[in-house]
Amino acid sequence: MRLAVALGERDPDSLDFYAGPEEVVAAVRGEPPSLRAIGLAAGALSARVSAERLDPAEASRARALSADLAAMMARVDLLTGTRLPYDKESVAFFGVAPAPIDERRLAQIRSQIADVVGHGGRLVDRYTTFAARFTVPADRLPDVMRAAIDECRRRTVAHVALPAAEQVTLELVRAKPWSAFSRYLGDGQSVIQINTDFRFTVDQALQVACHEGYPGHHTRNTLMAPRRDASARPPERSIQLMFTPEGLESEASAMLAADVAFSTDERVRFVRERLFPLAGLDAAGAQRHVDVERLVGELQMVQADVARRYLDGELEFARAVTQLEDRALVPHAEALVKYINQYRTYVTTYTAGRQILAARLAACAGPNPADDVRWRCFQRETLPRGAETIP
């Protein structure tokens, strides 16, 4: 825990949350180690973990600790000047690199989108114009987000045992590199921040509610982290480091949260009957809106490809922006490239990570699974054994 807190003090982007004893933070801040000292200590601890003779019940915990420590050392190397090619950096942090993308399939998806939003001119412009019809007005966004969060929670607690006192608080912010962020405070409490510099369509608002809240980040963190009434959790569960294999699992599960909470028909029905009226928008196009957003979501793998080429020096800033607009239909492409400047290979977590987890869920649940099967597989594939049990 001390190493993770120390790294977070030196590099706030590395630490998603810490919900452990405050005295650890005080001790680190009283005598903060250098990045080099953190890297050396992580290496020494990794060697100790590897040398331990453990029973099978502890072996998986040791493997996870070793992977996180290796990723921590790689992060220290990056912060102290080491630069690796995108794929090697991604493997060092997350254990995986994005697979080559299927350009033919992506072209088919863009063609399907064009059939809905119209032909002629740049597709990103036509998609942006189409999406504007479903964009939540700024003054109505808080009500839409709260209703979406409430429904995502209602569906989640029907399948997942959450502690009675857990809750999320909604906060509107500006001038952030991301569109939304969930900050876990500990003991089942999170703050979901929504960046109002971005615009959200109705379906995107629902995706954010599930992703950041239920059954996404807040739910996962609540179930995994120790609480005052459940101190038996391993202490490392009090920490979420972003640039680790655990960080990839967390982001991948959040990316699929809306698909677990809602079938396609349920999703269309809820946005049409509940969110469109709250947004003050005509719900006649709800089906087409959800269909197009699903297709645009399938283009996200382009983001990893562009990030790889950009960070490896094959694309300059302006060309990276253009490729994100033309190939992935990203409306805030400049903001995304600035995000890549700051978070680099974290793009892997919500692109390749999503693909990997989606394949595991499909293998577990099979085609067209019933709700209870879908939820059971989601918990089994995204949470360590026992994390879903509330004492």
Predicted features by range, described:
Residues 1-391:
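N-terminal maturation segment of proteins
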